[in-house]
Amino acid sequence: MSLLLSFYLLGLLVSSGQALLQVTISLSKVELSVGESKFFTCTAIGEPESIDWYNPQGEKIISTQRVVVQKEGVRSRLTIYNANIEDAGIYRCQATDAKGQTQEATVVLEIYQKLTFREVVSPQEFKQGEDAEVVCRVSSSPAPAVSWLYHNEEVTTISDNRFAMLANNNLQILNINKSDEGIYRCEGRVEARGEIDFRDIIVIVNVPPAISMPQKSFNATAERGEEMTFSCRASGSPEPAISWFRNGKLIEENEKYILKGSNTELTVRNIINSDGGPYVCRATNKAGEDEKQAFLQVFVQPHIIQLKNETTYENGQVTLVCDAEGEPIPEITWKRAVDGFTFTEGDKSLDGRIEVKGQHGSSSLHIKDVKLSDSGRYDCEAASRIGGHQKSMYLDIEYAPKFISNQTIYYSWEGNPINISCDVKSNPPASIHWRRDKLVLPAKNTTNLKTYSTGRKMILEIAPTSDNDFGRYNCTATNHIGTRFQEYILALADVPSSPYGVKIIELSQTTAKVSFNKPDSHGGVPIHHYQVDVKEVASEIWKIVRSHGVQTMVVLNNLEPNTTYEIRVAAVNGKGQGDYSKIEIFQTLPVREPSPPSIHGQPSSGKSFKLSITKQDDGGAPILEYIVKYRSKDKEDQWLEKKVQGNKDHIILEHLQWTMGYEVQITAANRLGYSEPTVYEFSMPPKPNIIKDTLFNGLGLGAVIGLGVAALLLILVVTDVSCFFIRQCGLLMCITRRMCGKKSGSSGKSKELEEGKAAYLKDGSKEPIVEMRTEDERVTNHEDGSPVNEPNETTPLTEPEKLPLKEEDGKEALNPETIEIKVSNDIIQSKEDDSKA
């Protein structure tokens, strides 16, 4: 249609004889996105002299590299490359003829910008604790709507008010921390075009280094080949790099320094004095750096250079010296090992005997009026704040002999050997001698006197044969410190005095318990038992009952009921039996009916119940029988009666009913009558729920034993057959060889061994002679009845005993004021603290 219109207009012009201009542009309106290229063709009808293009600002367009105008006859083409927003507007195409007349046409160019992301960097890194701004520059025309998403949730909906969108569409995170790391999505939308685009941005939070140094101060000793390791751990993100500095210089690994674990450990080797000082650990990463300092203090450890053992004498004085060196100068402490008591410089004991003085690493411990308790080990400890050193010395105290035992009086009698012990301690050890009347014992004419040395003891064994052997003996001990002696007395022993306070404390038809008091004097020799004599009043024969040890209580058994008895008590020591006590009379109880029996029960096997009878008071006559009556409690059954012999200790009730309660009455009978009945009630358990009998439940004991023997024989046969085929031995192999006429050398040897053994048993076997001793023949301790060693030819029959003894647990006690000591027909009153038996 437009073409026809053009030809029509052309015809009009030709016919009129005038050339009219007419301008057209191929496009009247164009939309173009930024960055796209477009061209427009302008056509002039007529005889144009020129065709020009004008930009929206009215300026004539001159060709450039981006905007190009090309003219081809009556056409002119405008090309715009890589259009931008500024290119938008109305472009005019103007044609001019020779007469200067112009015609023009216009085209409207609209330029829009697609969603464009500029300067979007991923990842974006921030420092922990700062206010972060995540940059996302997005543009379009019209302006886009921008939103941020984190974990598929818009940040504007997150309750954390640290997140906010800025006016420039960037995301702000206040006080960002490590937990905020992740992927954030920047999304742009153009509603008019339905256009959407996004960019995922990785946000990384860098944490500045934080150094952890578990120990900052170190002590080391110089010139000892020691080494010290510093530890420096650093946390942060990214992982910090650790380096060490000393005096401002970087430490590198060499013979002096060792670096381990990514420089987390620094070891200083062969420490010397100059190695002391600060060591700086520095940790660095993108977020910053941190440093901490470790300090190495190098000291000379204390060392004791002089300490030696000392020897002094009792009541003397001595000075103990301890010298030590070190840097810093150490303090010296003394410690007495025996009691753990410590002394430091300036200390003084309460009694003023011990005093410590010292200065500049030297200490002196001075002791005056030396006591034996001061002897022993002394520890010297030199200590400073970097360590310590300890050594020990020994203080030896020499002293004159000391007699340990306080017992100086011993008792014996003619024909009874006794050992007198002279126990001496001394330093140095003393020489010990026995004397009597200035005569050193044993003398040639004193065959009944012998001496034995056992360590620090010198034992004098005396076997008295006459009154002359009783009297004073002297023990003398000597060393280079001094001489000491002690006098001992061998006194003539006597039999004990009579016990008193005899009484009956318990009484029955056939027994009586007798109690009495110990005698006032045991005669100088310990009492080893008491003798209680008992007889019926009408009888002349006394029965003797011996006490157990020195117990002052004796039980008399097998007495006749309702009978009057007489008793008397005498004490017996090594010398012999003492005087009897005053005779006491008592009467046993008459025979009566037994007391009610005491019963306790428990279920027995099956439908039976076991009633156990506790030993009871039989009234003085043996129990002849028990009469048992029982019946069920749940119904009015008649009583069933059962009699059991009196020597039985239990009763079995059989054929009872499951879960049934029973009532039992038990009466005991002796020859005088019946006791009151004892009532006992019990209930039977429910019937057992037996699911299945096993094989062995159905077999008797003999069958089970038979099966066991058969199994054992089967195992032996299998073992013998295995030995036959594997090792060519066993019973089967023996039978085979005998049947085949073979005989091994080992069999001959075995036979010879058997024959030799038989000959030995026949000719040389003799049973050893074993000496048997009954319980009554055993030697017992007279004090508590325990076994003791039997006396030999050098052991006296009596043991020395300290006086006085405590009156407790049945042991003998002797009042020293009542003892007379017989010495060579003289009477010597013993002292309370020296009288020892």
From Swiss-Prot:
Q: Which InterPro entries match?
A: FN3_dom, FN3_sf, Ig-like_dom, Ig-like_dom_sf, Ig-like_fold, Ig_I-set, Ig_sub, Ig_sub2
- Regions of biased composition (Basic and acidic residues) lie at 764-785, 799-814
Q: Which UniProt keywords apply?
A: Cell adhesion, Cell membrane, Disulfide bond, Glycoprotein, Immunoglobulin domain, Membrane, Phosphoprotein, Repeat, Signal, Transmembrane, Transmembrane helix
- Major location, coarse class? membrane
Q: Where is the Ig-like C2-type domain?
A: 21-108, 113-202, 208-297, 302-396, 401-491
Q: Where is the composition biased (Low complexity)?
A: 789-798
Q: In which tissues is it expressed?
A: Expressed most strongly in adult and fetal brain.
Residues carrying a glycan:
N177, N219, N309, N406, N419, N445, N474, N562
User: PTM Phosphothreonine: at which residues?
Assistant: T780
UniProt record, GO biological process:
axonal fasciculation; neuron cell-cell adhesion
SUPFAM superfamilies (UniProt xref): Fibronectin type III, Immunoglobulin
Record's bilayer topology term: Single-pass type I membrane protein
Q: Name one Pfam family in it.
A: I-set
Residue ranges in the Extracellular topological domain are 20-697
Please give the residue positions where the record annotates the modification Phosphoserine: S765, S786
Sequence ranges on the Cytoplasmic membrane side? 719-837
Task: State its location(s).
Answer: Cell membrane
Bilayer-spanning residue ranges: 698-718
Supply the CDD domains for this chain: FN3 (cd00063), Ig (cd00096), IgI_1_MuSK (cd20970), IgI_1_NCAM-2 (cd05866), IgI_NCAM-2 (cd05870)
Q: List the disulfide bonds.
A: C42-C93, C136-C186, C232-C281, C322-C380, C422-C475
For the Fibronectin type-III domain, which residue ranges apply?
A: 498-591, 593-688
What does this protein do, in the record's words?
May play important roles in selective fasciculation and zone-to-zone projection of the primary olfactory axons.
Q: What is this protein called?
A: Neural cell adhesion molecule 2
What species does this protein belong to?
Homo sapiens (Human)
Q: What is the lineage of its organism?
A: Eukaryota, Metazoa, Chordata, Craniata, Vertebrata
